[in-house]
Amino acid sequence: MNIQRKELLVTSFALFSLFFGAGNLLLPPLLGYNAGENWFWVTIGFMITAVVIPIIGILAHARLQGTLFDFGKKVSPIFSLIYCIVIYIIAVAIPSPRTAAATHEIAIHSAFGTSPSLTSAIYFSLVLVFVLNRSKILNLIGKFLTPFIVIMLLAVIGIGLSSSAFTTGISQIETPIVTGILEGYQTFDAIGAVVVGAVIIVSLNFKNMKVEAFESKRKLIRRSGFIAGTGLFIIYAGLISVGAYYGSEIEVNSELSSDMQRANLLRGISIASLGEFGNTVLSILISLACFTTAIGIVAGTADYFKGLLKDSQTVYVVTAIIACVLGVVVGQLDFKSIITVAIPVLLLIYPITIVLILLNVMPEKLATPLIFRAVIISTILFSIPDFLGAIELREFVEPFVEVIPFAKYSLGWVLPAFLTFVVSSIVQLKITRDR
C-alpha cells in the first residue's frame, strides 16, 4: 500500500471514529424500532443531519484549512469569537461528559458495579493521556481503535439482519422524515464536524503536512470526508434497519427512559446476534466509540484556545485538564439528565452551525459578509421560539409556532433562512453589478 493511500485510510478511519460516539450507536436502533414499517423514511431524515451536513462541514474545513473561527468570521470577528467559545463550552460540557455517562451506565456499571465518579475519573484520565500525546492522536485512532470498532459494528449488523425474519411493527412515528432529522440533531455530528475537522487539520500539520500544498491537503481531507461519510451512512442504515426488523423480537420496556430503552434494545440485539458474548461486544463497542469521541472533543477545544492565545503549549495543557475535570464532574450525572439539558441548547446552536457549514461551501460570490450576516441573523431569530419552547416557555412562542412554517416540528428557522439567503443574494448581485 503506497503512503498516500495509507494516509487516506488512516485519516478516514480517524474521522469516522471522532464522529462516532455514544449517541451515534444508541440512537439509530430505537429510531428504527419506533419507525417500524417507515424505517426507510426515518433513515433519510436521520442521514440529513447525521451524515450529509457533517460531511459538508468537513468539505468546508477542507476549503478553509483554518480553525473554527474561520467559519463565522464573515459575520463578524466578534460573532465568530463568541460562537467558537460557546461551541467549545457546549462540547466539553455536554457531548464529552455524555460519553463518560454512557460508558458507565451501559458498559462499566453492569459489569463492575463502580460509582459514576470512579468511572469518570479513570475515563477522563485516559482521555487526558491521549490528548497530551497530541501528535500521535491520528495514528492511534485511525490505525488501531477504529478498525476494531467498525469490524464489531458490522458483525452485530450483519448477523442481526441475517437472522431476522424481516418483519416490522406498525410505525409509532407520524412524521418519519422530520423525526429522523431531529434525532440526527442529538448525535451532535454537525457540531462535531466543525470541531473534529479542525482536529484533523492540526493532526495533519503535526504529521509534517504543514508544508504540503494547500490543494494536496484539501484533496486528502475531502476524500477522507467522503469515505467517513459513506461508513457512517452504512452503519446508521444498518443499525436503524436492525432496530426495525430485529427489534420487534425484543421486548422494550416502555416505562424506562428513552435512553435506557435505547441501551436495552441494543443490548438485546447484540445478545440475540452474538449470544452472551454480545453483551461483552456491546460494552467494548460503546467504551471505544465514546472514548475516541471524547479525545476529539477535548483535543479540538485545547487546540482552539492554544491558537487563540499565541500558540501556547501551556494553554493547550491547561485547557485539556480543565475540559477533563469538567467531564469528570458532569459525567457523574445520568445520561438522561445530560440529554435533557442538551436538547434546548441544540435547538438554538444547531441551526446556526448548519447554516454556517452550508454558507462556507458556497461559491465566493454567494458567500459574502452581507449574505452571511443576513442569513445568520434570520436563523438566530427564528431559532429562539424552538429554544424557548424546549425550556417550558411554550406559551410565549405559541403564536409564532402557529404562523411560521415547520415551526411545530422545531424547524421554523429553515424557510426564513432560505428566503433570506435568496433575497440577500439578489441584493449582493445587484450591488456587485452596479460597481
What is the predicted function of each stretch?
Residues 31, 99-116, 205, 294-321:
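Helix-loop-helix connectors at the membrane interface of multi-pass transporters/channels
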Residues 35-125:
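Membrane helical hairpin/interfacial module
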Residues 62-69, 124-145, 206-209, 328-340, ...:
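Membrane-water interface regions at transmembrane-helix termini and the short interhelical loops
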Residues 10-20, 157-164, 173-242, 281-290, ...:
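Hydrophobic, membrane-embedded alpha-helices of multi-pass small-molecule transporters
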Residues 132-160, 342-354, 373-381:
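Membrane-interface loop-to-helix entry segments
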Residues 5-15, 40, 76-89, 118-122, ...:
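Select transmembrane alpha-helical segments in multipass membrane proteins
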Residues 354-422, 433-435:
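C-terminal membrane-solvent junction of multi-pass transporters and transport-like membrane proteins
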Residues 230-264:
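Extracellular/periplasmic helix-exit of transmembrane alpha-helices
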